[in-house]
Each structure stands twice: as C-alpha cells, then as structure tokens.
C-alpha cells in the first residue's frame, strides 16, 4: 500500500508584500483518508496555509505536495483538481442556473466528455444526499442544502483532499447533523478549518492548532480539547458546560 500522504507541508513560511509574516515554518502531514481539524484563533495563519494548498499563494520558503505532486506552476491545473476548497459561504461557488450545472461546471471546464460529466454529477449529488435537486435553482434551497451542493461541486472533480472552511457556520441543528453524516461517509482526505470545537470532536480524530503562524499542538482532538490551558493560551473556547471527555 502506498505511503505517500495526501498532503505534505514542509517548513512552509510566507510573508505578504506588506511585510507581515503569516507563517513561520509550518509542517503538516495528512495521510489518505484522514479527517483533520485545523484550529486556531483569528489571525493565526489558517487561511494563509489553506491558500497554499492549491497554489493560490506561493513564493515563500518550504514546499507543499499533494499526493506526491509538488505545488508548482507546471502542476497547478492538476493540483487544483486534487485540492477542493469549500468556502464558508456556499453562494461564493454556486453561480449557475441549476444545481446540476453548478456541479458539472468543473468537469466540463476540464474537458471531460458529457457522459462522464453526467456520471460525476449524479455521483456527487448522491454523495451529499441531493440527487433530487439537480434541476432546481440553488437559490431555492436552504442554506444547509446549498452548502452540501457546494461540497458536491468539489466532489465532482474527484479530489484527493477536501478543505472545508467553517463548514458548520450558520447551520441549524438538523443542517449540522446532515452535513456531518455526509462528511463521515466521504472516502476522501478532509482538512476542516473551524472554530466549532464540538464539531471538530464529532468529525475529526486528530486536530492541529495553529497560532502565530506556527503549529502549537497536533494530536487527538479529544485530548487537545480537554487541555484547558492550551485552549486558553490560544483563544479557543468550548461551549459552556461542554465536556469533551464525556462525549
């Protein structure tokens, strides 16, 4: 069995043009099939790190590889297929007249034949339990349904890594549960950026805490969330009365 990780970040450092240093030698490895939560306060460098994973940001020190393929100019088309990012607001990536056309957009843009596009659309919508919505306008769906369709737009590209930005935000309890059920069933590597610590515990056995542009903790989610001093140092808070050791 291959030991090549889905995602490898090695000594990644990055400064913006204004001189702000956002990352200081970040190391991160996600093995195939892992679901990992990326935790940290605002301004920790989480977004900067995520934007390196598919080559939107580059130019600093270190390297990023996706399933062994370096994130470099010559590989960007394939890298962006392999790393699918689902934004916090699903309306940022749903812009076609129907759900089916939104999910088909990526495969069509990659020049896949129409029978393959149709198969991928059907498979991706089935994976997020939205198979009956292909002909519906996205704006007729609930927020939670639109978020699941946004996931489907990425799944149709058969990614190696699925990156989720605050996936539980603005969801009601039923929407949280439905999305969790979808994510737990997906056969892809997942990196979940979130402030929702109970959701991280529900979905991810492992968590990485980033603060000040460095990884300050990496380990079992339950153990990290039970460390009150760690949470306090890095401005992470559990809901009142929530005990991660009892869930």
Language-model-derived ranges and their functions:
Residues 115-133:
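Conserved ABC ATPase "signature" region
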Residues 54:
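Helix-to-loop junction immediately C-terminal to a conserved catalytic motif
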Residues 162-165:
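Catalytic Walker B motif of ABC-type/P-loop ATPase nucleotide-binding domains
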Residues 39-41:
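The feature captures the beta-strand-to-loop junction immediately N-terminal to the Walker
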Residues 214-237:
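Conserved beta-strand-loop-alpha-helix hinge in the C-terminal portion
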Residues 62-70, 79:
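Conserved ABC transporter NBD signature motif
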